[in-house]
């Protein structure tokens, strides 16, 4: 976790100075109806593999054109499933180019990303595969043990 005793101390000082945590939280968590409609579409793409240890979620090129880089949180939705070890977010940049975000609870996803020319950290990594979302997903699933 990135939350330390110092983080909480600073938060305490902010509240003592007049910061209103509920207002901050509501502002950060606010979502438009349009964003929720897109989220609904994205949620319908969730799939599980390898005895529910691997989960995928997809964002089509059309939806990516609307969202831009605002894809935070989607990979966490599937990573938080109790049986899931490897969570894969597949973002279609174009019909034949897919950007991948990998997260894990135990598996070295950096090794998986390296296989496709990407990299990162043991528990969080990424890569780009010159293929459609379906083809990229198939290639990834072949590599994941």
Describe these PLM feature segments.
Residues 1-115, 120-144:
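Hydrophobic helix-and-loop "lid/oligomerization" segment in the mid-to-C-terminal part
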